[in-house]
């Protein structure tokens, strides 16, 4: 792939990511107490998309043939870890708002940034051969992070289904939240595929960045559609409805 073609394709794909993030930031959300954490989740998702788009544009200034490519891999691993944290918390807050607090998010972010800072320090201070061992260890930690977030999501999803089962039929719950499961599993697949970016291969970079742009556009659409399911999810989560109401239309009428 020629330098000019690579540059153009990466700029287009990265520009689409930035545009998706900006459009998501402009989406209006209900201005009420129940939607407060939904707005926070939207901000987290917006930040994750913009973070990747801007990083890909900045990465174009790196020399892929020089030693600085290792620094690019460090930053790519850091971006992937932060994105995994943001996406997971954005999904979790929609099914278990009490599990996502500012303190927990900052704690997770602090641990991720500490590990990434140590990795960059190893790149600067240690011989290249030694640094590569540290880098491989950080890749293993990243995979462990994805496994941990998957376990967290599955546990809270089971709790959520048990919590709302008193209010709605199982089919209605599954139909309303099907997209949320798709969102998480696609995000997990993206997190795994992000490891391919560490190969520093131009063709892989272009293909994966284009795929990420499509996936994140899908994420944004799903996230916007969540507002249609909010009458189902939020009242049950916050226990604002005292009597069991097993019909979405009846519940909506009750809340209005």
PLM features per residue range, with description:
Residues 1-118, 133, 137:
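N-terminal low-complexity or simple alpha-helical regulatory segments
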Residues 22-29, 56-64, 88, 94, ...:
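Transmembrane helix-loop junctions and nearby membrane-interface residues
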Residues 32-54, 108-109, 134-216:
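Alpha-helical transmembrane segments of multi-pass integral membrane proteins
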Residues 80-87, 144-148, 214-221:
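Alpha-helical transmembrane segments and their membrane-interface exit regions
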Residues 86, 149-152, 246-249:
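Generic recognition of short, well-ordered alpha-helical interface segments
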Residues 92-105, 212-237:
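Alpha-helical transmembrane segments and their immediate juxtamembrane interface regions
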Residues 119-120, 185:
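Short alpha-helix boundary/capping motifs
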Residues 224-256:
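Membrane-proximal linker segments that couple transmembrane helices to downstream signaling/catalytic modules
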